[in-house]
A protein has these predicted regions:
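Short Lys/Arg-enriched alpha/beta "domain-start" segment
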Residues: 61-143
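Amphipathic alpha-helical packing elements
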Residues: 286-340
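Generic recognition of cysteine residues
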Residues: 82, 91, 145, 151-154, ...
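Intrinsic-disorder-associated interaction segments
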Residues: 5-9, 72, 76, 80, ...
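N-terminal chloroplast transit peptides
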Residues: 1-65, 89
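Phosphate/adenylate-binding glycine loop and adjacent helical scaffold
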Residues: 126, 133-176
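Short secondary-structure junctions and interdomain/linker hinges
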Residues: 260-267, 271, 325-328, 337-341
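Mixed-charge (acidic/basic) macromolecular-recognition segments
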Residues: 173-301, 308
């Protein structure tokens, strides 16, 4: 990894960790008498980290079923439920749950008050869906999801969601990132959907959301070597962790997911038409030529994972919570398995 890229990744993780630590210290400053009464009112029961994580994972599953549980406080649970429900309704044929090792499916750090849960699955239309949620109460709410289309839909991009809220008070940082991540820099590839995103975000149906969420252009310093981000990416830094931010960001996720599903439909039809024309010797004049082949689409998705493995600042954050070995194994086997080829 280039030194400037590593420095930025470490800086982001350090900022998030500092925000978490600040809120932890603030809680520690609570009068001891009140804290003592709270402890006395709580049954004394010890649980291992794995048992605690498993219990949190079961609670998470219940939350996913109703989609609204826990939304009395700021969270991205509704976003998680929306993506999961929509994908399973539109792309669930032939669904297979992917096995995620128990050590990675749920992990808790009781001292930090943070639990991380992950699920993964595939279907006929989707090569892989990986959804990760970090629940640290008021100190951390993070939802990250990556949806890889089946490689037969050669020119379909990867749908990515990255929603982050860490820290409390003045130390709180919120970031909203949603994109249809290109697997090729080819102009024809990007022209098939990026203009739709730009129209949607800049003066279209999401213009009010963009204003309310403080949408901005990602820093060139941070994204100068960003191979897998489109010009239509929705990137925002909301000032407040409130109901409006939850609702507006959910509107963004829904709208971008709709564009992605439409593009997936188109990419599948284009690939089928091109394949049929080639098989039967028909003219390709009226068929949009796919930029990628099934094989090159697979290679591009795997290259995406390899790039993310070296650049994603969340790995450093996970290392601060669960240790470097766990974080690296989690990144290589669960977050970005395509990096292994």
């Amino acid at each position: 990894m280039p030194s400037h890229t590593r420095a930025r990744a470490v800086a982001i993780a350090r900022d998030a960790k500092a925000a978490m630590d600040a809120s932890t210290r603030a809680r520690a400053a609570t009068p001891r008498r009140a804290a003592g009464r709270a402890r006395a009112a709580t049954p004394r029961r010890r649980a291992s980290g794995r048992a605690t994580a498993r219990g949190d994972a079961e609670a998470t599953a219940r939350t996913r079923e109703d989609g609204d549980a826990g939304d009395a406080r700021f969270s991205f649970r509704r976003h998680e439920a929306c993506v999961r429900t929509t994908l399973r309704a539109r792309c669930g044929e032939g669904l297979e749950e992917a096995r995620v090792d128990d050590a990675f499916a749920a992990r808790a750090n009781a001292k930090r008050g943070v639990t991380t849960t992950t699920e993964a699955w595939s279907s006929r239309r989707l090569r892989r869906v990986r959804s990760t949620y970090v629940d640290g109460g008021e100190k951390a709410q993070i939802y990250n999801c990556a949806v890889y289309p089946a490689c037969e839909a050669c020119d379909a991009p990867v749908f990515g969601v990255d929603l982050i809220c860490v820290g409390v008070g003045a130390a709180r940082k919120i970031l909203i990132g949603v994109d249809l991540q290109p697997m090729s820099r080819d102009r024809d590839y990007n022209d098939a959907y990026v203009p739709k995103l730009l129209k949607l975000r800049d003066g279209g149906a999401l213009s009010a959301c963009a204003e309310a969420l403080n949408a901005t252009t990602p820093s060139k310093k941070f994204y100068e070597d960003a191979t897998y981000f489109s010009r239509g990416m929705f990137f925002a830094r909301p000032a407040l962790a409130n109901e409006e931010t939850m609702a507006r960001s959910l509107d963004v996720v829904r709208a971008y997911l709709d564009v992605w599903l439409d593009r997936l439909d188109e990419a599948e039809r284009e690939a089928e038409a091109m394949d049929g024309a080639c098989k039967f010797g028909l003219s390709l004049e009226d068929v949009r030529r796919c930029v990628l082949t099934e094989a090159s689409a697979r290679e591009a998705q795997d290259a995406h994972d390899a790039w993310q493995l070296e650049h994603d600042p969340a790995i450093a954050m996970f290392a601060s919570w669960y240790g470097e070995e766990w974080a690296r194994d989690f990144a290589e086997t669960v977050l970005f398995p395509g990096a292994r080829g």
